[in-house]
């Protein structure tokens, strides 16, 4: 696929449970009335058949926005048993949900089950996870503590994946003569992606990650400069980090079809205010339009050094955009 990597975020959640008008982001992303396991499965099959590089699963229990959600690890394991070559990843794991020794064991097991196809995406649990944690009885902590916990989580996992007997004495986690067997098939371990924007998270990226993931197109160029600075300060080559971007795509064959589709989404969002203003806000956040327009928008990210994209297609549960993007967008990049 032209030397670039394209993955698909799987639709493992149901519709928004928010009554009345939804946010324009939700209106763009989710246009279906229930969680559909068949749609999840067929998305994975089509992605593999069209040579997409990867499929990705978010890590949530449930939220105030959506009660219907599939759990991350059991979903990835299910999909590993159904597919053969496509890579399977988490985007992103929350360090508050699982002890890292358990996480390391789960990851090693799934890497073996999938014949070395596991991708591990980590984050530090953004603020909207707070309500989810409170509902589930998971203690919520501030951002600095979450970042420290993420750092220790990655350190513990790497120790267990590399050492015969691991010992660790951290602020939050510890190991005493611990072991994890079998080791992951991928050496030294499954690729680690860390998602984040802030200065402290980008420092962690520079120190521990194989890849950085930005969660949208806003402020990307400025944040890249911060990441470069962190890499320089620790003596790491910036180019050794793969740059990945999560994007949402709304794709139609013609401009007329695209505008008709966006007007339907505008109405689904409540239809308040001016459509052109609403569309302008949406187009700041999304890669959208005709195939030619999407190619042009993606080119700007290639110029910034991005080589991998995790796509949330906006036409779900329809699967039409997946082959259209593969045939009319990717070959022109």
Label every PLM stretch briefly.
Residues 67-90, 149-156, 323-333:
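Alpha-helix-loop-beta-strand connector modules within alpha/beta enzyme cores
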Residues 51, 59, 79, 110, ...:
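Conserved, mostly hydrophobic/aromatic
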Residues 4-35, 95-167, 212, 219, ...:
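Flexible, glycine-rich active-site loops centered on histidine and acidic residues
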Residues 35-47, 103-106, 194-207, 290-300:
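Short, acidic/polar
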Residues 142, 154-158, 220-231, 318-333:
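C-terminal helical cap(s) of enzyme catalytic domains, especially alpha/beta-barrels
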Residues 1-30, 128-132, 171-189, 255-284:
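N-terminal small/glycine-rich loop or linker at the start of catalytic domains
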Residues 6-10, 55-57, 87-90, 118-122, ...:
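Hydrophobic faces of well-ordered beta-strands that scaffold small-molecule active sites
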Residues 1-82, 188-190, 312:
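N-terminal beta1-alpha1-beta2 module of alpha/beta enzyme domains
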């Amino acid at each position: 696929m032209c030397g670039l990597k394209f993955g698909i975020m799987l639709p493992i959640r149901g519709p928004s449970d928010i009554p009345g008008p939804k946010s324009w982001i939700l209106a763009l992303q989710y246009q279906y009335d229930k969680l559909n396991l068949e749609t999840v499965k067929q998305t994975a099959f089509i992605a593999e058949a069209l040579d997409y590089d990867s499929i990705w699963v978010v890590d949530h229990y449930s939220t105030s926005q959506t009660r219907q959600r599939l759990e991350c690890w059991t979903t990835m394991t299910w999909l590993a048993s159904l597919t053969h070559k496509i890579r399977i990843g988490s985007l992103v794991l929350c360090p508050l949900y699982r002890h890292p020794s358990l996480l390391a064991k789960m990851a090693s097991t799934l890497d073996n089950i999938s014949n070395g196809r596991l991708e591990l995406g980590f984050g530090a649990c953004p603020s909207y996870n707070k309500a989810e944690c409170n509902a589930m009885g998971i203690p919520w902590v501030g951002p600095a503590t979450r970042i420290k916990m993420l750092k220790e989580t990655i350190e513990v996992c790497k120790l267990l994946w590399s050492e015969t007997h691991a010992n660790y004495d951290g602020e939050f986690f510890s190991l005493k003569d611990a072991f994890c067997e079998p080791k992951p098939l991928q050496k030294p371990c499954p690729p680690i992606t860390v998602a984040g924007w802030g200065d402290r998270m980008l420092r962690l990226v520079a120190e521990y990650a194989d890849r950085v993931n930005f969660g949208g197109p806003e402020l990307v160029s400025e944040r890249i400069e911060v990441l470069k600075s962190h890499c320089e300060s620790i003596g790491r080559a910036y180019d050794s980090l793969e740059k990945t971007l999560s994007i949402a795509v709304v794709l139609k064959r013609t401009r007329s079809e695209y505008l008709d589709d966006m007007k339907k989404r505008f109405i689904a969002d409540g239809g308040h205010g001016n459509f052109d203003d609403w569309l302008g806000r949406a187009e700041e956040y999304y890669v959208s339009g005709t195939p030619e327009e999407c190619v042009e928008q993606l080119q700007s990210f290639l110029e910034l050094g991005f080589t991998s994209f995790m796509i949330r297609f906006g036409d779900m549960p329809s699967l039409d955009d997946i082959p259209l993007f593969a045939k009319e967008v990717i070959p022109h990049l």
